Amino acid sequence: MDLPPQLSFALYVSAFALGFPLNLLAIRGAVSHAKLRLTPSLVYTLHLACSDLLLAITLPLKAVEALASGVWPLPLPFCPVFALAHFAPLYAGGGFLAALSAGRYLGAAFPFGYQAIRRPCYSWGVCVAIWALVLCHLGLALGLEAPRGWVDNTTSSLGINIPVNGSPVCLEAWDPDSARPARLSFSILLFFLPLVITAFCYVGCLRALVHSGLSHKRKLRAAWVAGGALLTLLLCLGPYNASNVASFINPDLEGSWRKLGLITGAWSVVLNPLVTGYLGTGPGQGTICVTRTPRGTIQK
């Protein structure tokens, strides 16, 4: 299913128009909370919001590229820079969502033990590790891409593919023999593993909610916050990573499904700020998960 270029353009522009201000608000809200008390959830939220902000900044260029049917509109050296700026947040977001979910689950399942060891410095270390893993993986994939001009009558280097007498294409014409294994490894390590962690933690938070003493309204809100990360992974990042797996198994499925997956991935910049819960400015409006202990109900 090929989306019309005008529709792809409109979807990218809409994601930018909504996601850019939402993530600015999320950063502002998280910073205001951090001034009162810095917590691991705030650290993950700040990194996620900054990651989404970087992704949102690349969306206007992606929209222009879609309107031009994939033709790269900038000078060729900007292609690898764009690749890192666009795809690093796309993959890193799953790691930050999994880290947020793990923190909520540990706070619910082991409230007092987790309270004793939860330190923002540990969360900063996790975030640095996620960024390093993503950037090294992407950098290695781009660096190993070899020029194939003598083989397939094209000029290819660092993500740019230029058919002879044709227009430059960034990444989307990447040699399939290199692209499919690389994209599959990205998806397994940076999406499906975080997805499993997030799903496990979501079930743990739901079990804690069942035994909590909160009102029905607050239980619903807590369930939404706990399930928001899983929802974002499935709805926004799921289609793109599923297309990577499908195209590895059956190369005929590549192309239009990948383009659709990139569009849904772009909309994660809209959904993430809504589910992390830091758009408000008042204290205590952030992400929560609850549990009942012998000393009362604890919120995370």
UniProtKB/Swiss-Prot annotation:
Tissue and organ expression note: Expressed abundantly in pancreatic beta cells.
Matches recorded under PROSITE patterns: G_PROTEIN_RECEP_F1_2
Superkingdom, natural source: Eukaryota
Keyword match Transmembrane: yes
Signal peptide: none
UniProt topology in membrane: Multi-pass membrane protein
Extracellular side: 1-8, 65-79, 143-178, 249-256
Disulfide bonds: C79-C170
Glycosites: N153
One term under GO cellular component: plasma membrane
Function recorded in the entry: G-protein coupled receptor for medium and long chain saturated and unsaturated fatty acids that plays an important role in glucose homeostasis. Fatty acid binding increases glucose-stimulated insulin secretion, and may also enhance the secretion of glucagon-like peptide 1 (GLP-1). May also play a role in bone homeostasis; receptor signaling activates pathways that inhibit osteoclast differentiation. Ligand binding leads to a conformation change that triggers signaling via G-proteins that activate phospholipase C, leading to an increase of the intracellular calcium concentration.
Name this polypeptide is given: Free fatty acid receptor 1
Species of provenance: Rattus norvegicus
Organism lineage string: Eukaryota, Metazoa, Chordata, Craniata, Vertebrata
